[in-house]
Regions:
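Acidic/histidine-rich catalytic neighborhood of metal-dependent amide-processing enzymes
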Residues: 154-247, 259, 277
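Intrinsically disordered, low-complexity Ser/Thr/Pro-rich tracts
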Residues: 1-82, 109, 126, 356
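Active-site-adjacent substrate-binding region
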Residues: 232-356
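Structural recognition of the beta-strand scaffold that forms the well-ordered cores
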Residues: 79-82, 115-116, 133-137, 145-149, ...
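N-terminal capping segment at the start of a domain
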Residues: 60-97, 110, 153-154, 313-326
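Solvent-exposed loop/turn segments at secondary-structure junctions
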Residues: 89-91, 113, 120-124, 141-142, ...
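Extracytoplasmic/secreted proteins, especially bacterial periplasmic and envelope-associated proteins
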Residues: 71, 75-78, 82, 94, ...
Length: 356
């Protein structure tokens, strides 16, 4: 049974969404309340070195409709609040498992039939633990797929509002908007577990895809740390694999949205990929990567997100400053605005983009 604060939080989120009105391009999403629950494999940590305090798994309350908000970003904001209320979601911990269940329930409530993919991983001290990916598929007019991915774990010192409840929130909101729409391509939403521990979830998924599934994947879209940083970016490889990045930049220009890119930059740290796009890039799958940071600060390597007078010398991710209370007080309106822009961009990718 959920604790009273979980119930109150979810009732508040769903009441807000249900009372919202929707623009003509975003019809209300009808939710079939008769969809049976999905059986989930348990993911129990085995002696992790940074075990988070256990929490009861949140439950999404039944609703006749779960309509997109009046403004893009409203739903994403609600998911950030819910995920950070769970606490730090350390890889392999009970809190990570609760967050995965929250995402599974959210997809189910929207009318998807999500699946889980469990895997084993090892922490820095050699302890084995279990995590899982949560996967939901929106069939499109083409069987070719766009993978949209966001990790749902966090660092052990952080509630992970920016890194990466923000990415999950954007993904879940777009999933809500498009569930009843025709899309040019099939959209495969994946919430990755254990990103903070060597990108475990994305690497496991990519390793077991099989060559046919890789060949069928048009592009991977990575959503990570979207709420805090000063500037809004979309990255990719250069050359022929930059087709979606260039499309997004042109679309953003047409819609007066401040998305930019950094070209010819090595998006690795000491030769290692730094986010979930890496597992796909290694296998020849094109990617784009949405992120908010500031490449003009610090060592100009993208790690310093904001002016060094804020956060931990400009760092929000992996610090105690990565929470909504601090972000809202320090950067009023930023979280909501970033959610609006990134939801708009991902919605356009899913509903408008087509290869020539």
């Amino acid at each position: 049974m959920s604790s009273p604060w979980h119930i109150a939080l979810f009732i508040l989120i769903l009441a807000t969404l249900a009372c919202s009105t929707v623009g003509s391009t975003n019809p209300p999403v009808e939710v079939d309340s008769t969809i049976p629950p999905v059986a989930v494999e348990p993911s129990v940590a085995v002696e992790p070195s940074t075990q988070a305090a256990p929490v009861e798994e949140p439950t999404i309350q039944p609703a006749d409709t779960l309509a997109p908000g009046n403004n893009f970003g409203d739903i994403a904001r609600g998911h950030i609040e819910a995920l950070t209320a769970i606490g730090a979601r350390v890889s392999g911990s009970d809190n990570e498992r609760a967050a995965g269940q929250y995402i599974l329930d959210a997809f189910t409530q929207l009318g998807y039939t999500p699946e889980t993919q469990s895997f084993s991983a090892w922490d820095e001290d050699g302890y084995e633990f279990t995590s899982r990916n949560v996967i939901a598929v929106k069939k499109g007019n083409s069987v070719r797929e766009i993978i949209v991915g966001a990790h749902y774990d966090s660092g052990d010192e952080s509630l992970g509002a920016d890194d990466n409840a923000s990415g999950v929130g954007v993904m879940l909101e777009v999933a809500a908007h498009i569930v009843r729409l025709e899309t040019p391509y099939t959209i495969r939403f994946i919430a990755f577990g254990s990103e903070e521990n060597d990108l475990d979830g994305s690497y496991y998924y990519a390793e077991v895809m099989g060559q046919a599934a890789r060949d069928n994947t048009l592009v991977m879209v990575n959503l990570d740390s979207l709420a805090a940083g000063d500037n809004l970016y979309v990255y990719s490889d250069e050359g022929q694999n930059a087709f979606l990045r260039d499309w997004v930049l042109a679309w953003a220009g047409d819609n007066s949205l401040p998305l930019q890119t950094i070209r010819d930059v090595e998006l690795t740290d000491g030769g290692y990929y730094v986010a979930d796009y890496g597992a796909f890039a290694e296998r020849g799958i094109p990617y784009i990567y949405f992120e908010a940071t500031n490449w003009t600060l610090g060592d100009q390597d993208g790690y310093t997100q904001v002016d060094p007078q804020y956060g931990d010398e400009g760092y929000i991710w992996h610090t105690p400053y990565d929470n909504l209370a601090y972000l809202d007080a320090t950067f009023p309106g930023r979280v909501n605005e970033h959610m609006r822009i990134f939801v708009s961009a991902l919605y356009a990718v899913c509903t408008e983009f087509e290869l020539p």
